[in-house]
Structures are given as C-alpha cells and as structure tokens.
Amino acid sequence: MQDAERTTNDPVDRIEKVTWRDLQDGSFTAELKRLICFAAPMAAVVIIQFMIQIISMVMVGHLGRLSLASASFAVSFCNVTGFSFIIGLSCALDTLSGQAYGAKLYRKLGVQAYTAMFCLTLVCLPLSLLWFNMGKLIVILGQDPAIAHEAGRYAAWLIPGLFAYAVLQPLIRYFKNQSLITPLLVTSSVVFCIHVPLCWLLVYKSGLGHIGGALALSLSYWLYAIFLGSFMYYSSACSETRAPLTMEIFEGVREFIKYALPSAAMLCLEWWSYELIILLSGLLPNPQLETSVLSICFETLSITYSIPLAIAAAASTRISNELGAGNSRAAHIVVYAAMSLAVMDALMVSMSLLAGRHVFGHVFSSDKKTIEYVAKMAPLVSISIILDSLQGVLSGVASGCGWQHIGAYINFGAFYLWGIPIAASLAFWVHLKGVGLWIGILAGAVLQTLLLALVTGCTNWKTQAREARERMAVAHESELTESELPI
C-alpha cells in the first residue's frame, strides 16, 4: 500500500511529444520487443478463440443445409445482440485496470474484474429473454419458419454461454492488463482440445443434432471461465491483484459504466456496420452469390485481423500501464512502435492475399462463379486489411487512453453517415452490386482511420498522463477510506 501511495504521488514526466531523436536512444527498439513478446502469444489466443466458434459451425454444417442455415443465422443474431455488446462493455477494463496496474494499485484489478462480472451478468438478463424468443421474433420479421424455429432453439442453448461470457471477458482482461498472456494461451488451448471431441459427441452421438453445437460452445465457455478463475484464485502470479468479494465491487459500478457504455458503442457500431452490409447484399440480384462472396471476404478479414487485434491489445495494455505510472514519454513511444508493427503486418498479409487471389477462394467454395468473384474482390479486401490493421491499433490506443467516447462518435460518423450511404448508393443506384457495398464500407474505414490518426496525432501525452494519475489518486484515496464489508 505504501508503494501505491508513493506511486500515485509521483510527478508526471515533462515530455509532451516524442521526437525522432528520442526514438533513436534504444527505447523504440526495446518497446518493439515488448510488444512482439506480448502480441505473438496473444495472436495465438485470438485465433484459438475464433477456432472454438468455427469448430461448432463446421460440425453443424455437415448435418445439412437447414442445420447450417439456422445455426449461421442464430450465431449472427447472437453476435450482434449479445456477444458484441458484452465484449464492448468489458473493454472499459482496458482503461481502468490497465491504468490501475501502472499506478501499482494492484488490488484494484481484482475488484474491477468483479464489478465488471456483476454488471455484465445483469446485462445478460434482458439479452437472454431476447435470445429465448428469437425464433418468434424473426418469423414476424419475415424469416422462413423452419429456419426461424431451428435458429431459435440454437440461440436458446447459447444462453448459458452468454452468462459464461459475462464472467470470461473480465477475466481475460484481468490477465491481459497485467501482461499475463501465458495463462490465457494455456487455458484457451486446453479448452480447444476439450471442445473438439465434446462438440463431436454432442452433435453426432447424443441425438441433439445442431443443438449440440450450441451446447458444446456454452460448456466450453464455462470451462474457459472456470480455468481462468481457478488460475486467478490459486496462482502466486495473481497474489497482489486478486481481491476478496466485498461491498467495494458495487462502489465501482458507476465508474465502470462511465467507460463501458462508450466502449460498447465504439465496438458495436463498427461490428454492426459489417453485419448491415451482409443484410444489404441479400437485397441484390442473385443474392445467394452476392451474400456468399461477401461472407467469404468478411471471414477472410476476420481471420487476418487476429494479428492486428493482438497488437492492439498489447498497445492498449502498455499505454494504459505507462499512463497510470505517469510515463507520458513511454506511452507515446508505444504508439510509434505499435503502428510500425501494424504497418509491417498489413503490408505482408495484404500482399500475400493479393498474390494468391486466384487461390484463396477455393478454401471456402468449389463453385466457379464464387471463386472468380472472390478473386475480383481480392484487391479491395487487401486494402481493407491494411486499413483494419491501422485502425485496429489506433482503437487500441484509444482504449488505453480512455477515449472510447471519441471512438464511438468517429465510428458512427465514418460508417453510418459516410460509408454505408456510399455503399447503398454504389450497390443499388450505380449497380456495382457487391463491389459497391465493399467500396462503401472501405470508404468508411478510410475516414475512421484518418480521424483516429488525427486524434492520436494531436494528443498531449503529458495531459493524458496527468489525467490518468488524478484518476488513480482518487481511486487510491477511496481504497484507503472505504470500509470493506464482506458480502
């Protein structure tokens, strides 16, 4: 506690901007190494988490068209109305816990994780009612009754997974904000190894059919949360940051919501814009071809985004830690290092995709028209990969600094006032069809990246560090004065 008091009273360094000369003293190279050591295993974690979802879909897909269509619709619905919102709300911890760790208020990480679990569990209650009645709702909206019925059953069996997600996401950020990536990598790998045979048994051997895919996913999320919770409780690596359950978790609800709502808005506004493009593709002539091609392109973008997402997570953690410690110069250097990694990754991946544009369509489809259309879209997808890498890291910078509200405004303007209107105009009025839709979402991504870069470039890092220190000083005072009554 004395360390924390000394840390929160330490002065903020006087550096407002980092110059080129500052980047040549070894700090930049050292930061690159830190980010790579963080991002490499984190990328593996992201890929494994993605594959857990894919495995369920692949196994369900072998049951037939109705099972695949209903499961795909249910997963898309649940992602938009639930999982995306839970992930977005939990991103508040990227600011709060990251800066608390930098300020050496270690115990706050455990308290904030419990606060997040409590808030997210409450959010799951109305969401679960929505999922339970999904089948009836989408029939009213005009969906095929057979697909709607089976999709509703699939969503209902995903409800336990939603509550698991409310516990899991704060735990993931609890470890990430301490740069403890090994527990995430080990537990996600173990869960994946369990999920594959579990999903196979439930889908093919239990008689549950496609419902088994949803149940397997829910059970795997609970296993993941239990494993991480056990590591948090028993590991000596978490001895300083874990906290007992006290009334203190309720006192942090207001602060959590302050950052959680704009965090959710920032993430969901971008996520939902891509889902809207898929829906618009269904209104085009030959909707089966257009939707299939755009789905393949978005799936490719999701896979290639794993590395930028890991770099963004590393940047967010490092920046929040340094700002919490009052090191404005170090936080600014992290931005340069993270953007350098993002540029290198974007160029390598986009050029590889462009070079193999006549090949990668075969991975997803055997239909000749689909493969040719995917090859035609490849140059646009390559540009999207570059923009996604840059904006992903810039969004990580925003989370580390606590600018989620600015990011939400930017994403709303870039996609809903600019990108999607352009997409609809090009697709339906200029008759560019799927290409027009992608150009529109690309225009939104360009504006989003430029605005995030402008905000980052105009940032006074000394002021950011001072604000973080003031926030942590208030947190430290409350930690010293509040009474900790057991629940």
Swiss-Prot record:
Family: Belongs to the multi antimicrobial extrusion (MATE) (TC 2.A.66.1) family.
InterPro entries: MATE_euk, MATE_fam
Domain of life: Eukaryota
Record's subcellular location: Membrane
Record's bilayer topology term: Multi-pass membrane protein
GO cellular component, one term: membrane
Annotated Pfam families: MatE
Keywords attached to this entry: Membrane, Transmembrane, Transmembrane helix, Transport
Protein name: Protein DETOXIFICATION 10
The keyword Membrane is assigned to this record: yes
MF (Gene Ontology): antiporter activity; xenobiotic transmembrane transporter activity
Membrane-spanning ranges: 35-55, 73-93, 122-142, 155-175, 184-204, 211-231, 264-284, 293-313, 333-353, 377-397, 412-432, 435-455
Keyword field contains Oxidoreductase: no
Taxonomic lineage: Eukaryota, Viridiplantae, Streptophyta, Embryophyta, Tracheophyta
Organism field: Arabidopsis thaliana
Single GO BP term: xenobiotic detoxification by transmembrane export across the plasma membrane
Gene: DTX10
